Every structure is written in structure tokens, then in C-alpha cells.
């Protein structure tokens, strides 16, 4: 690569779609293959395989955020046209990742006897097989951690076409190889060996593509200790976020199980798990935006415009979906799970849907903070409200049960959005004019008007399915027409047409 990356709307849109596909396809493969894997392995062995997947996920935190740090600093170098820095950034990060991965593997080897014999409830006849499985799994940890950094190098250059060309098949193989192993009569160690070979192949494919995109990486092998501090400083704050986010997201279910009858955990979890699937789109968009924000860090005006537009696009895409889900929540749950379930979870579903929407919007300023090298601000926001949130969550669950849990989750998402937006507003020097210029203010106004129109019409005419259906259809048609006429500018429309035409080809 001889020149810096040019950040364009059509490129970001195409990459978002690619990332979306990259998350959806393996999900479908998992849904299809898992029943056959369970049938072939049996419940106990499948449980151990599931633990192996979880362990790889947890040990990946040992990369200390260096994968995201690599993406940030390579993208920043591209934005400043400082190509000579990239080999040192990449090799320094990889060396660090390799060391941490080996350390993680050694830790797993040491912990395996304790995990298998004392902590996990493993059947006696499977203890030896489980130990062998975990020992083999330890070899995967450095491979998985290094792969994350190499993938991040490609993401920095907005080469999500190459990333997903590797990521989609490798993610699918995570489920297909156990199925193949079952048909071949393999036990768990054999399946783990197949997965290890696949992961090594994935890592090598990423490395070869990095050599292709950045030829200097192949020619210049350089580990520069000057990069250790910025890499680990950035990655350290990312790690704090990665530790806190699962706690904030999943603590509600633990509290529900403590305060309410255990069945209510299921009522709540089903609503959350279904709605959380909507996070695939903002997650795909955020994955694309992070390196773009880093690349544009030296061009403040373009960075501001991209950030404001990202909020606008998220509002325009997620807003109508959430509106439909809130209006028809009871009908959806009734058809899917029955009237008894719907009566207990409709309001929970509606509140969580609003929370998911606010969380999707909050991902935009959160990614901007990471992109401009301020993940410390994101981590400090999480740290500032974690204890008040825990107290509020506990109080609301005691007072209102699972409705209180949903309310606490949505309030947390709202506070998060306000804090992230406020900090970005201040440090980026945003103003009302740039919100108007890029259509965000009009988008918020129109969406708010549509919500008021829909809710007031339903309140006056009644909540029958016919009234709600006609009202929703009219509101959505108006929203689309107004959006096309007054919110999307010429550049947005050109990007939309170009993206559709590219995908069509």
C-alpha cells in the first residue's frame, strides 16, 4: 500500500454490509449444525466443547486490548501518511501478543487439573478426555490472540472484504469441523485438533493478506520498544471496558435469580436475547467506523461530519425497527410464546427495545472516543456509574421485578448515551450548526414527531391490531418520504445507490 486510505461513504456502507454478513452467516451455520453436534457428541461432551469455546473467549482478554490498539495506531498512521511506522507497530504488537498468548496457554495448562477435577462437574469417565482437550486448547490461545491483531491491521486499511473472506469461513468452521469430527467418529481431542489446524490456517491467511496490503511489513521486521507504551496504554483502557461491559450487561439476570422466582430469569432472558440480536447491525457499523475515525483524526472537520452522520444513520435505520417492535410487542410474544408468556413479558420487551436503541446510538460516540485515542474516557464513564447502577438495579428489581430490571437497563443505556455524547460534544468542539448541516437535528425532530403521532393516534382510536397496523404503516411511509426529501443529502443518496449497485454486482 503506497497511499493512505480514502474514507468515503460508499466504502463505509459496503464494509458495514460485509461485516453484517460476516456476523449473520456463522449464526445461521451454528443454528443448523449445533443440534447434530449435540446428537453426535451427547450432552456431556457437547457441554465440554461449549466450555472450550467459552475458555477461548475468556482467555482472549489476555490480549489486553492490543488488537484494537493495533487497528487504531495503524489507521492513524495511514491517515497521517506515515507509512514507515506501520511495520514497527505491527511487529511490536504481534511480539507482545505472542508472549501474552503463550502466557495464557501456560496458565490454562496449570489450571486444567484444578478446573477438571475440582471446579467443573465433569463425569468421571470423561475426566481424562477433558484434560487432554484443555491441554490441546492451550495451543490455540496464542494463535487466536495473534489472529486478532493481524485482522486489526487489515481493518485499519478498511479491507473488510479481505477480513470477511477469511472470517466468514473460519467462523463457520468453528461449527462445521465439530460436525465433521462427529461423522468421522472423533472424540473431543480430535475435534480440538481440527479446530487448532483451522485457527492456524486462519492466522496464516491473515498474515499473508497483511503482507499483500502492506508490502513493507514483509520487508521490514522491526520491534520498537517506543511503541510498547502507547500500545499497552491504549489497550489497558480497552481491557477495563471489556471487563466492565459484560458485568453491566449480564448482572441483571443474576439479581433477578436472587430476588425473583428462577422462572423469571427465563422470561427476562428470552426478551433480552432476542432483542440483543439487533445489535448485530450497530456492531457491524461500529466495527467499520472505528478505524475510519482513527484515520480521520488529523482531519477534524471530516471526523466531525462522519461522527454526526453515523448517529443520523443509526437513528434512521434502528428507529423504525424499534418503533414497530414496541407497538407490536404483545402480538409478537403472543404468537411466538403464547398468551401466558406475553402477559408477563410485553412491557419488559418494550422497555428493553428502547434500551437497545439507545445503546446502539451510544456505540457511535464510544467508538469515536476509541478512534481518537481516548478509551480512558469511555472506561472512566463505566467506572463512574457502575456502583450507582448496581444499587439502582437491585432497588428496581426488588420493587418491580423483571420490569424494574428492564427499566434499570434502559436507564443505564440512556445515561451512557448522554455522557458519551456530552463528552464528545466538548472535546470535539461540536455545535448546533454541524448537527443541522449533516441532517441529524432534522432526523431527531422527524423521528420524535412520528413517535408522538403514532402514540397519540393509538391512544385516541384504540389499541386494536387494525388501528395499530394502519397507524404504523402510515407513520413509516411518512418517515421514509420525509427522510428521503429532507434528511438525506445528495451525498447520502449517492452512497445508497452506489452501495446497492455494488452489492448487486
Q: Can you say where each PLM-predicted feature lies in the sequence?
A:
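Membrane-proximal transmembrane or re-entrant/amphipathic helices at the cytosolic face
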Residues: 1-6, 452-505
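Interhelical loop/hinge segments that connect adjacent transmembrane helices in multipass membrane
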Residues: 1-12, 206-249, 297-305, 426-442, ...
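N-terminal membrane topogenesis motif
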Residues: 1-29, 84-91, 128-130, 211, ...
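Signature of the first transmembrane helix
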Residues: 8-76, 105-109, 140, 175, ...
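Transmembrane helical elements of multi-pass membrane transporters/channels
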Residues: 14-30, 194-202, 206, 210, ...
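Helix-loop junctions and terminal segments of transmembrane helices
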Residues: 64-80, 94, 156, 214-216, ...
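Interfacial segments at transmembrane-helix termini and the short loops linking adjacent helices
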Residues: 112-137, 325-356, 403
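Hydrophobic alpha-helical transmembrane segments
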Residues: 166-213, 230, 234, 383-388, ...
Amino acid at each position: 500500500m503506497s497511499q493512505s486510505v480514502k474514507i468515503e461513504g460508499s466504502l463505509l456502507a459496503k464494509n458495514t454490509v460485509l461485516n453484517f454478513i460476516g456476523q449473520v452467516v456463522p449464526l445461521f451455520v451454528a443454528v443448523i449444525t449445533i443440534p447434530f453436534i449435540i446428537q453426535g457428541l451427547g450432552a456431556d461432551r457437547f457441554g465440554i466443547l461449549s466450555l472450550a469455546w467459552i475458555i477461548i473467549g475468556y482467555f482472549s482478554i489476555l490480549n489486553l486490548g492490543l488488537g484494537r490498539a493495533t487497528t487504531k495506531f495503524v489507521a492513524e498512521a495511514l491517515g497521517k501518511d506515515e507509512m514507515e511506522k506501520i511495520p514497527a507497530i505491527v511487529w511490536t504488537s504481534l511480539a507482545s501478543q505472542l508472549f501474552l498468548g503463550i502466557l495464557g496457554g501456560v496458565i490454562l495448562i496449570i489450571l486444567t487439573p484444578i478446573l477438571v477435577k475440582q471446579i467443573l462437574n465433569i463425569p468421571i469417565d470423561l475426566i481424562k478426555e477433558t484434560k487432554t482437550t484443555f491441554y490441546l486448547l492451550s495451543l490455540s490461545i496464542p494463535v487466536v490472540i495473534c489472529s486478532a491483531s493481524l485482522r486489526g491491521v487489515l481493518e485499519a486499511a478498511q479491507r473488510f472484504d479481505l477480513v470477511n473472506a477469511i472470517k466468514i469461513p473460519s467462523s463457520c468452521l468453528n461449527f462445521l469441523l465439530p460436525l465433521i469430527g462427529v461423522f468421522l467418529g472423533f472424540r473431543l481431542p480430535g475435534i480440538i485438533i481440527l479446530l487448532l489446524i483451522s485457527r492456524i490456517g486462519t492466522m496464516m491467511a491473515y498474515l499473508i493478506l497483511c503482507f499483500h496490503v502492506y508490502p513493507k511489513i514483509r520487508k521490514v521486521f522491526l520491534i520498537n520498544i517506543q511503541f510498547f507504551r502507547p500500545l499497552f496504554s491504549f489497550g489497558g483502557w480497552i481491557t477495563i471496558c471489556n471487563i466492565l461491559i459484560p458485568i453491566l450487561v449480564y448482572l441483571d439476570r443474576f439479581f433477578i435469580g436472587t430476588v425473583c422466582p428462577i422462572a423469571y430469569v427465563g422470561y427476562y432472558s428470552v426478551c433480552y436475547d432476542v432483542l440483543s440480536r439487533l445489535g448485530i447491525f450497530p456492531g457491524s457499523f461500529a466495527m467499520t467506523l472505528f478505524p475510519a475515525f482513527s484515520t480521520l483524526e488529523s482531519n477534524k472537520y471530516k471526523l466531525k461530519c462522519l461522527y454526526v452522520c453515523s448517529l443520523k444513520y443509526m437513528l434512521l435505520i434502528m428507529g423504525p425497527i424499534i418503533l414497530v417492535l414496541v407497538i407490536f410487542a404483545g402480538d409478537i410474544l403472543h404468537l411466538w410464546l403464547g398468551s401466558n408468556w406475553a402477559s408477563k413479558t410485553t412491557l419488559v420487551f418494550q422497555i428493553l427495545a428502547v434500551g437497545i436503541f439507545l445503546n446502539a446510538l451510544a456505540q457511535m460516540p464510544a467508538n469515536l472516543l476509541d478512534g481518537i485515542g481516548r478509551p480512558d474516557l469511555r472506561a472512566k464513564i463505566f467506572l463512574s456509574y457502575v456502583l450507582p447502577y448496581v444499587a439502582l438495579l437491585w432497588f428496581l428489581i426488588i420493587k418491580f421485578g423483571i420490569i424494574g430490571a428492564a427499566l434499570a437497563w434502559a436507564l443505564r443505556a440512556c445515561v451512557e448515551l448522554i455522557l458519551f455524547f456530552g463528552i464528545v460534544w466538548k472535546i470535539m468542539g461540536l455545535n448546533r450548526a454541524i448537527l443541522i448541516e449533516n441532517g441529524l437535528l432534522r432526523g431527531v425532530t422527524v423521528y420524535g414527531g412520528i413517535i408522538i403521532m403514532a402514540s397519540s393516534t393509538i391512544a385516541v382510536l384504540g389499541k386494536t391490531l387494525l388501528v395499530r397496523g394502519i397507524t404504523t404503516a402510515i407513520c413509516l411511509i411518512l418517515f421514509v418520504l420525509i427522510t428521503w426529501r429532507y434528511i438525506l443529502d445528495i451525498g447520502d443518496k449517492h452512497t445508497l445507490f452506489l452501495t446497492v449497485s455494488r452489492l448487486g454486482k
